[in-house]
């Protein structure tokens, strides 16, 4: 029997039944227990959501920027008031440790909405003089109806990241969460409605990739913001362009390098590498999974990482002491185990982990040990391909130029990091790394103020930061003539 009632769609400010007649189950990754049956949206449901969004968007855009800002701030207050209950729901649906969801997922999502609520009143145009009797002014106008397609690793945070700039700029958003973690986006919809966001301005349509394709191809949607894998992102981008030349934002995969130089504080470097690989059980798109270590400090670094891996507390996500939970699904577990086996077969040396955990309370869950491979080569699958799990690959390098060249030798370009005590080297290397998000002597923080996104096949456009708000508007140019019109004929 499911823990929660059947989950419906959220359209027009309230819950409605899907017309498809289809449902799917969402499971607790820690136990395998069915959390809820979720209704699958049909094409008719997507059309209904679009009609609702168009109507709501007109009302929302007609408000002043200050009015929109106040409503979004009320939503922030509600998110923070309900942080603990939302974190508990997110833990059940994703398998993340409660210590993590309490401190990160809802907190950072609320921060982003608060950030854009503050920027809503700063949207402005320009005045451009042409001559004494004529000038141009520009207006930044909302796009209209936008769609967000979320990933399963940060369900409510991603919903906040995508909806905040869209709504602040006067748009409506139809959001499709991942079918693997579909619960918390509905709670965000409830909160937006309670805060005073007009009906239809934030709709949630549940379902698998068919629903994402419907959104990408819909002619009345002006923009798609997608978070997920590269291959799916390419399909979404193709459909978005072919249907109506939609604007797109793509936050895709990565195989990010972390460079540890021989002058680094190795204790700090080991802390950074461990966090960059095992936070959220390694299910983070920016993970620094390719750890390049300068030869002279390789053995010491490896020993320090092993010390830290031994301190990781794998356990029930609901236990406050746990800091490493299960993978999100059986499919993800088997994918990760397949990569671990590949690493062994290709000759990498297993330093730590590598096995599924099945004893005791791990029996029903999707648990795998934090895994570290050393003696890795650039041509190994575990080094080349995104695993999206707790698998660290340690590689050795001799000099700066070599490290940079190898770090950049990838189709991805999402994130990169450098650990060194040499300030000049830190900036010199970072400036040559082909990645959109970079860290020096730290890893992983993505505050609301910081634009995040990738180079190469890791994405298009950015999320967060001022620049993202601009991409949820379009510019209208208006020329005004104060003098007589000069006829051509």
UniProtKB/Swiss-Prot annotation:
The residues the record assigns to binding K(+) 2 are: 245, 456, 459
* One term of GO molecular function: betaine-aldehyde dehydrogenase (NAD+) activity
Catalytic EC class: oxidoreductase
Q: Which family does it belong to?
A: Belongs to the aldehyde dehydrogenase family.
Q: Where does NAD(+) bind?
A: 150-152, 176-179, 229-232, 253, 285, 386
What this protein is reported to do is described as: Involved in the biosynthesis of the osmoprotectant glycine betaine. Catalyzes the irreversible oxidation of betaine aldehyde to the corresponding acid.
According to its UniProt record, which residues of this chain constitute the active site?
A: 162, 251, 285, 463
Q: Which reaction does it catalyse?
A: betaine aldehyde + NAD(+) + H2O = glycine betaine + NADH + 2 H(+)
EC number assigned by the record: 1.2.1.8
Residues with PTM Cysteine sulfenic acid (-SOH): 285
The name under which this protein is listed is Betaine aldehyde dehydrogenase
Q: How does it assemble?
A: Dimer of dimers.
For whether the record's keyword set contains Metal-binding, the answer is yes
Q: Which HAMAP family match?
A: BADH
Please give the PANTHER family that the UniProt record associates with this protein.
Answer: ALDEHYDE DEHYDROGENASE-RELATED
Q: Which organism is it from?
A: Paraburkholderia phytofirmans (strain DSM 17436 / LMG 22146 / PsJN)
Site positions per UniProt: Seems to be a necessary countercharge to the potassium cations: 247
Pathway participation: Amine and polyamine biosynthesis; betaine biosynthesis via choline pathway; betaine from betaine aldehyde: step 1/1
């Amino acid at each position: 029997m499911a823990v929660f009632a059947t989950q419906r769609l959220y359209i027009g400010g309230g819950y409605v039944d899907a017309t498809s007649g289809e449902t799917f189950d969402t499971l607790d990754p820690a136990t395998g227990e069915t959390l809820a049956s979720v209704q699958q949206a049909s094409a008719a449901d997507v059309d209904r959501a679009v009609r609702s969004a168009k109507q709501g968007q007109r009302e929302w855009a007609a408000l002043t920027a200050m009015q929109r800002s106040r409503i979004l701030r009320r939503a922030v207050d509600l998110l923070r008031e309900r942080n603990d209950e939302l974190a508990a729901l997110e833990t059940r649906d994703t398998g993340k440790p409660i210590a993590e969801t309490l401190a990160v997922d809802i907190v950072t999502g609320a921060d982003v909405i608060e950030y854009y609520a503050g920027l809503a009143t700063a949207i402005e145009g320009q005045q451009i003089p042409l001559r004494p009797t004529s000038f141009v002014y520009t207006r930044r106008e909302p796009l209209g109806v936008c769609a967000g397609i979320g990933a399963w690793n940060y369900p409510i945070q991603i919903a906040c990241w995508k909806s905040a700039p869209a709504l602040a700029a006067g748009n409506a958003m139809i959001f499709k969460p991942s079918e693997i973690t579909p619960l918390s986006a509905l709670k965000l919809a409830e909160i937006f409605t309670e805060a005073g966001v007009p009906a239809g301005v934030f709709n949630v349509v549940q379902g698998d990739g068919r629903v994402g394709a419907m959104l990408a191809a819909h002619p009345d949607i002006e923009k798609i913001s997608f978070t997920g894998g590269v291959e799916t992102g390419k399909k979404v981008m193709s459909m978005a362009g072919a249907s109506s030349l939609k604007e797109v934002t793509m936050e895709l995969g990565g195989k990010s390098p972390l460079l540890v130089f021989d002058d680094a504080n190795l204790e700090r470097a080991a802390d950074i590498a461990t966090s960059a690989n095992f936070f959220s059980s390694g299910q983070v798109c920016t993970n620094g999974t390719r750890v390049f270590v300068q030869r002279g400090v390789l053995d010491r670094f490896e020993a320090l990482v092993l010390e830290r891996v031994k301190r990781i507390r794998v356990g029930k996500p609901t236990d406050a002491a746990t800091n490493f939970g299960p993978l999100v699904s059986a499919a993800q577990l088997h994918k990760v185990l397949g990569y671990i086996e590949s690493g062994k077969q290709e000759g990498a040396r297993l330093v730590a982990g590598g096995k599924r955990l099945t004893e005791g309370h791990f029996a029903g869950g999707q648990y795998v040990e934090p895994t570290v491979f050393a003696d890795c080569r650039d041509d190994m699958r575990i080094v080349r391909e995104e695993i999206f799990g707790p698998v660290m690959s340690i590689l050795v390098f001799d000099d700066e130029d070599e490290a940079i060249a190898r770090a950049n030798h990838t189709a991805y370009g999402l994130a990169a990091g450098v650990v060194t005590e040499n300030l000049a080297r830190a900036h010199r290397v970072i400036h040559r790394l082909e990645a959109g998000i970079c860290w020096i002597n730290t890893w992983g923080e993505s505050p609301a103020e910081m634009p995040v996104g990738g180079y190469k096949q890791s994405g298009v456009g950015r999320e967060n930061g001022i620049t993202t708000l601009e991409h949820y508007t379009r510019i209208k140019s208006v020329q005004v003539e104060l003098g007589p019109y000069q006829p051509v004929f």
